[in-house]
Regions:
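Non-ligating segments of multi-cofactor redox enzymes
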Residues: 1-176
Length: 176
């Protein structure tokens, strides 16, 4: 199986939110919609003094879980959310989604959003439209100024990370 993934190097992320802007532009998302987001953690060192005045960033998007809680939570039959067995990509069928928000609530990562105009869930699909057009990277990875986001085959990304001595956060029961 050639499972696709994003690898996000948290040591390189500067919190610039270029990935958010690229995703919104690529997917023509409105101001209240999101498929990814950058969360600022900690205190602002410019306004806070002291030992713990660090600001960290967490780039967050769908983890494309092995056992997605969002699929299990979807009350629609057939499910409005599915997982591609070959690529591992979890997608929302916006036409089938009833907009109940159960999947958004069930996501353990808070990685799903909601389109109030279309009344359906939205989430990262690893730029499926771009991939179908032959583009070999995601919008977020293509604009990241620090190359903190890499798109590719999951196993290759894990090898690269290990080769560079990076720690892997890959022990979540939803991801196994």
């Amino acid at each position: 199986m050639s499972r696709l993934a994003l690898m996000i190097d948290l040591e390189r992320c500067t919190g610039c939110k270029s990935c958010e802007a690229a995703c919104k532009s690529e997917n023509a998302l409105g101001p209240l919609e999101r498929r990814n987001r950058v969360i600022w953690l900690g205190s602002n060192p410019e306004t806070t003094c002291g030992e713990n005045s660090a600001l960290d960033f967490l780039a967050l998007s769908c983890q494309h879980c092995e056992r997605p809680a969002c699929i299990r939570a979807c009350p629609v039959n057939p499910k409005a959310i599915s997982k591609d067995n070959e690529t591992g990509v979890v997608t929302v069928n916006e036409d089938a989604c009833v907009g109940c928000g159960e999947c958004v609530t069930a996501c353990p990562y808070g990685a799903m959003g909601y389109d109030p105009n279309g009344r359906h869930a939205v989430k990262c699909d690893l730029c499926s439209d771009r991939r179908s057009e032959g583009n070999n990277t995601t919008a977020c990875a293509s604009v990241c100024p620090t190359n903190a986001i890499t798109f590719g085959l999951r196993e290759e990304l894990l090898k690269t990370s290990k080769k560079h001595g990076r720690g892997i956060i890959d022990n979540d029961p939803f991801l196994l």
